[in-house]
Swiss-Prot record:
The organism's place on the tree of life at top rank: Bacteria
GO cellular component terms attached to this protein's record: cytoplasm
Single Gene Ontology MF annotation: ornithine carbamoyltransferase activity
Family: Belongs to the aspartate/ornithine carbamoyltransferase superfamily. OTCase family.
Protein role: Reversibly catalyzes the transfer of the carbamoyl group from carbamoyl phosphate (CP) to the N(epsilon) atom of ornithine (ORN) to produce L-citrulline.
Official protein name in the record: Ornithine carbamoyltransferase
Compartments, as annotated in UniProt: Cytoplasm
Family annotation (Gene3D superfamilies): Aspartate/ornithine carbamoyltransferase
Keywords per UniProt: Amino-acid biosynthesis, Arginine biosynthesis, Cytoplasm, Transferase
InterPro entries recorded: Asp/Orn_carbamoyltranf_P-bd, Asp/Orn_carbamoylTrfase, Asp/Orn_carbamoylTrfase_sf, Asp_carbamoyltransf_Asp/Orn-bd, Orn/put_carbamltrans, OTCase_ArgI
Binding-site residues, carbamoyl phosphate: S54, T55, R56, T57, Q81, R105, H132, P133, C134, Q135, C260, L261, R288
Claim: Transmembrane is one of the keywords in the record: no
Pathway: Amino-acid biosynthesis; L-arginine biosynthesis; L-arginine from L-ornithine and carbamoyl phosphate: step 1/3
């Protein structure tokens, strides 16, 4: 089987992505019923490169490999020659001789692409400044579990046109739903990514207008990692874009609220929104584990029924 990478949602076909979502749900249900008895990754090793720290990403990938009988290696810039200037391609070629699959959480998407181009083993994007596709697998899985098929439905992104927003746009293309992106002027997502999605994506600047009749509402922090010095300015610019219980009241009666976490209560969301019955953020966070199990299984073993 040819080496497949998962750098954005566009690296898999819509049919493959739909299979992954259903497979993740099956894996989750099997774990609840039988415990971690399915171990297809025996003697397999995942190398995890972290330039950006994370709670959910590290724990979910390490646990996924442990449940499936494999092993995960944590590598920070201090642990590798990349931190001392070794070319990215050289590191990729070396690691491919030793491990079965690689996960990278970094700043530069171009650097990730350079690594994948030189790698003979699958590479997973666990977050770059441009995309966060693993989170979208968990998000669509959660939406599907809670509300059924997402095809033809309407999701709303409120906030910065950042890496999460870009992946939501790609998800609208691949899973065939409509997406309204609502942000302050000047914080729109990449124009080329929006254009590629065609009529599925609409840019708005009024949160109340954006959520009218929406099936799902989601958001993210106003200042991402590396943007801390912009926090004060962003708080001013995003005033009026906080997602609250009252804002959700203008969406569909059965609206679902998601947040990739960590959340800054009192900033992009009200202090109590995560506890609202319309929010499914804890289920969403837990689904990172199951969605990534399905992803690693697909990249190493192909389609498993």
């Amino acid at each position: 089987m040819a080496t497949r990478h998962f750098l954005t949602l566009l690296d898999l076909t819509p049919e493959e992505l739909s299979h992954l979502i259903q497979r993740a749900i099956t894996i989750k249900n099997r774990l609840k019923a039988q415990g971690p008895t399915y171990t297809p990754f025996s003697n397999r090793t995942l190398a995890m490169f972290f330039e950006k720290s994370s709670t959910r990403t590290r724990v979910s990938f390490e646990t996924a490999m442990a449940h499936f009988g494999g092993h995960a290696l944590f590598l920070s810039p201090r642990d590798t020659q990349l931190g001392r200037g070794e070319p990215i391609g050289d590191t990729a070629r070396v690691l491919a001789e030793m491990v079965d699959i690689v996960m990278i959480r970094t700043f530069s998407h171009a650097g990730l692409e350079e690594y994948a181009a030189a790698s003979a083993v699958p590479v997973i994007n666990a977050l770059t400044d441009d995309y966060h596709p693993c989170q979208l697998l968990a998000d669509v899985m959660t939406w599907t579990e809670c509300r059924g098929s997402v095809k033809g439905k309407t999701a709303v992104w409120i906030g910065d046109g950042n890496n999460m927003c870009h992946s939501w746009i790609n998800a609208a293309r691949q899973f065939d739903f409509r997406l309204r992106v609502c942000c302050p002027p000047g914080y729109e997502p990449d124009a080329d990514i929006v254009a590629a999605a065609g009529e599925r994506v609409e840019i708005l600047h009024d949160p109340r207008q954006a959520v009218q009749g929406a099936d799902l509402v989601t958001t993210d922090v106003w200042a991402s990692m590396g943007q801390e010095e912009e926090q004060a300015r962003r708080e001013r610019d995003f005033a009026g874009f906080q997602v609250t219980e009252k804002l959700l009241d203008h969406a569909a009666d059965n609206v679902l609220f998601l947040h990739c976490l960590p959340a800054h209560r009192g900033e992009e969301i009200s202090t109590t929104l995560l506890d609202d019955p319309r929010a499914a953020v804890w289920q969403e966070a837990g689904n990172r584990l199951h969605a990534q199990k399905a992803l690693i299984e697909f990249l190493l073993l192909g389609k498993v029924e």
